[in-house]
Amino acid sequence: MPEAPPLAGLRVLEGAGSLAATYAGFLLSEIGAEVVKVETAGVARQTPGEHVLARGKRSIALDASGWRALLGHVDAVLTDDSVPPPDPDPDLVRCRVFAWGRTDSRLPPEESLLAAATGVQALQWSWSRCPVWLVTPMIGYMTGILAALGVSAAFFARHRGAPGQAVDVSGVCGALALNSGTFVSGAGHRGSLSLGGDPRGVYPTYGLYPTADGWLFVGALTQVFWTKLLTALNRLDLLAHPHLQGEPMTFFDADVRALVRAELEPVFATRSTVAWVEALRAADVPCGAVGSRADFLRDPEARALGLAVPVEDPVLGPTWQPAAPVVFSDTPAPPPRPAPLPGGDTAAVLAEAPSWRRRFRASSGDGPRACLEGIRVLDLTSFIAGPFCPLLLAELGADVVKIEAPGGDPFRFQLFGFVGWNRGKRSLVLDLKRAAGREAFLDLVRAADVVVDNFRPGVMERLDIGRDRLARLNPRLVHTSITGYGSSGPLAALPGFDPIFQARSGLTVAQGGDDAPVLHMIAYNDYSAGALGALATVAALVARERTGRGQHVDVSLFRTAFAAQAAQMILFPGRPPDPRGGRDYLGPAASHRLYACLDGWLCVAAGSAAETAALGRLAGIPLTLDDPPDGPAAGALAQVLAGSPRADALARLAAAGVPAAPALAAAEIFGAPWLRASGCLGALSHPTLGPLQVVGPFIHLEATPATLGRPAPLLGADRASVLGELGYDAAQIAALVEAGAVG
């Protein structure tokens, strides 16, 4: 009989209405916590997505006295901007999820304003080099994952003697987390991934192409995949082209991009999307069909793998919804339960609550200085999704050792990006193809708590360090794998990159609207999978405190693509459409739109009739909430704002009571005083790059604070300290280096 889910026995009270906070509650429920949601009885949920996010929770109606009484019986509470934070309690984890965090901003908790003020809109690739209004609330989702991670880490720390504590997670930090590899500033560098970006993809070998009947994403990011692609297209002649002699990730120049597209577009236009997917998969080229969210939920491959599951909702009837966000080998997630009726569990919960006992209570001894203090993590990952997971674990206090092949992480060439994804870690080079390198790795495993890998399934087994062997060697080991299509199943061997799942999951179609699909500059599925991997790893550590055993944790980009758009991922007859964007999309209405000023852009988000009327007075024309983004009212306002410096325009809007924020460029992020007040910007000194400004830490914990940690390591810089801690002396280490087993 399987064990109970990782967070079984822990109770969370959710008093919040924002996407970020309710998504955090959804995730905690999905990994086993009993989440009690406070709602107004008899008031229908406003959107289909609310039925997904309320799934698995219990719903109660409470007045203020009932709220205070219930706080004394739960382990954690989730609140947002709409609810005052609860009083301190030595046994209670108090998580506040709020938009602007520790800044002094008085703006409403609007995703669009956050996206503007944190550089997210300005970074998005566009045809006209303007900022872009993003239709999918990626910031809210990432903030929710970080909040769930903070609560789980605080649970783990409390079990080890830490008190209950305040956990603060802001939308500002959520936005910056989604750009941890982009927002790195040093001498001569202020982030370049967005410069010259193409909405079809920054590299021509790694982008969207029209086919005979639709669109296709092709992911030939590396030289190996580029050669396989050209072989499949019968265009190996391009390997000899004088302008295409570098790695595909060097094909950044506009002329080179145009050259490659001119050669490839006519080829892809000759066949259907389905035919190309079949042919490219057979050639081991990463690829994916572009489709809608409804297509994704109907996808036969997704349903066969159990990633889209049927749920009978008491209001909506038969629906298809996302499966659990992650898979635990030994403590499986509970099967999905439909959303309760608002307030439907009030009587039962109030009857049970007096008998509830908190799982952990604060001890009188000294607790850990950080949530994961004393936890050793072996990081075998590369690129983005993999490294982001142990980065978050390092922020929470884990000792992370990045184990690299002799050539290093392939993304080391992304110098500042690598720094952003790999701070807080030490580096050890091991050649796992050599027996002596494997033995050194196995010695590390014996003393480790966690291994994180993002190899394709089968690679570790071929190296004789597969999960079964590691589990026998260290039964307490938590082994987290982050893959494209999962660790098992008929698709497991396929290569997977973030944009494949942007394309398949409807993300690109939603942003492009009736125009061409649009790739997001933010590697959204990568970052989400890494953050969900960190959450699942900590949850597995919590479970280990109960079971005494580790387990395997399976995170995939395919599964993440459902979970990271959970509120949009619901299918039922008559489902209303989600918002859609368009070409260089500026916003859905004149009152919710990006506008150009003399020296930059700003974002307006008037949410009431009064605010919209005030906006109209500035424009000198009547304006309503229904006025379109390209109508006369929007044109009049655009003309007024275009003649003003941005600071003056923002001051006029603020004086009129209209919410607005600057659409900051990447170069402006570290110079914004209010962003520095958020606590999510920091400084490090790198051994070769010198002083750097970076983003993080992303979660603020009162009693066991998170930290930026050390700068990203040089390749193999820590071999003496890491191996020395295992008892290797200098002569042994030198012999391993001489043999090529250690770098």
Segments predicted by a language model, with ranges:
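A short glycine-threonine-serine/GTX helix/turn-capping micro-motif
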Residues: 131-142, 164-166, 196-200, 204, ...
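Terminal low-complexity tails and localization/encapsulation signals of metabolic enzymes
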Residues: 1-11, 193-194, 210-211, 291-379, ...
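Short, well-structured beta-strand/strand-turn elements
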Residues: 34-38, 281-296, 356, 400, ...
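Substrate-binding/catalytic subdomain of NAD(P)-dependent oxidoreductase enzymes
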Residues: 154-197, 276, 292-293, 540-582, ...
